[in-house]
Amino acid sequence: MMQDLRLILIIVGAIAIIALLVHGFWTSRKERSSMFRDRPLKRMKSRDDESENEDFDDNVEGVGEVRVHPVTHAPHGAHGEHEAPRQAPQHQYQPPYERQMQQPVRPDEPVRQPQQSPRQAPVQPQGQQPVPHAAPQPGWQQPQPAQPPVQPQHQPQPVVQQPVAPQPVTPTVAQPQPAAPQQPVPQPVAAPQPAVAEPQPVEPQQPAAPQPKERKETVIVMNVAAHHGAQLNGEVLINSIQQAGFKFGEMNIFHRHLSPDGSGPVLFSLANMVKPGTFNPDSMADMMTPGVTIFMQVPSYGDELQNFKLMLQSAQYIADEVGGVVLDDQRRMMTPQKLREYQDRIREVKDANA
């Protein structure tokens, strides 16, 4: 039953997904088809607008000719029939300056006005081209030269200005110009260069690197001290020192030799923490001291790292016997980091003396 139910659910889900996809494709095609249908209408509208604009431009261009003919033939009934349809665009597209030309024509007689127009004939020779076209036609087109003479008046003016521009000879000025840039060339006089800023980074300060080579010897120091505010008993202290293998010797201090019986080279020594740092074995039973100092000079006889381990064991033994603590060379609690630092110093000296 469960398997049949799963199959049914899978089939129903697949059908629903397919239906959604089909509906999506159908709606997208419908939208696209509507968009394509609207486009030809827009194109037809744009074409109609362009055609209307072109017709309007054509009518505007022909206004001059249409305006002139009806003015001359208005009094004559014979010619009014041929030019009557052209009068409509005259009143619609006549510009203001053309209306001013027509107003003096209406009150006066049309026949006499073309006779007065030759007074403007001296203006026509400037535009030689309109004269031959006006000759075959009657005097009705004489007001047209009012427009062409304006254009030739502007045309000859730029022609006169063009030859004037090349007249000033500029290449002659180019000769003194190279002389000026040559003068600032000596100005950069290598003044900033002698500042010698580059050698200023003092490279001799880097000899810090050879310092480990100079450390050919060092002293490892430990302290065994009483707790804060207390002191070590001299009698207990001397017994623990002797049991740790120290022997009283030179400089009135105790030394730890290679052999516990006091024979062989000295490995490390023990001194009093109080100045002058010496001991008197006869009076140590009555002595009280805040602590003692154990030190080892490196390099020493044998393996320095093994000697360091023996020194640390002796300090811990004495501290346990007298009830004190082991401190480092700065009289702080001994830590594993400090012990590694001591070992690194010993290795460094060994490498320098290798």
From Swiss-Prot:
Keywords: Cell cycle, Cell division, Cell inner membrane, Cell membrane, Membrane, Transmembrane, Transmembrane helix. GO terms for biological process: division septum assembly; FtsZ-dependent cytokinesis. One of its GO terms (cellular component) is plasma membrane. It holds the Pfam family ZipA_C. Residues 120-144, 152-164 have a biased composition (Low complexity). The chain crosses the membrane at residues 7-27. Its main location: membrane. Coiled coil: none annotated. Residues 41-215 are annotated as: Disordered. The keyword Ubl conjugation does not apply. SUPFAM superfamilies: Cell-division protein ZipA, C-terminal domain (SSF64383). Residues 28-354 are cytoplasmic. It is found in: Cell inner membrane. Residues 1-6 are periplasmic. Residues 178-191, 201-210 have a biased composition (Pro residues). It is a single-pass type I membrane protein. Residues 49-60 have a biased composition (Acidic residues). Belongs to the ZipA family. Essential cell division protein that stabilizes the FtsZ protofilaments by cross-linking them and that serves as a cytoplasmic membrane anchor for the Z ring. Also required for the recruitment to the septal ring of downstream cell division proteins. Interacts with FtsZ via their C-terminal domains. This is Cell division protein ZipA.
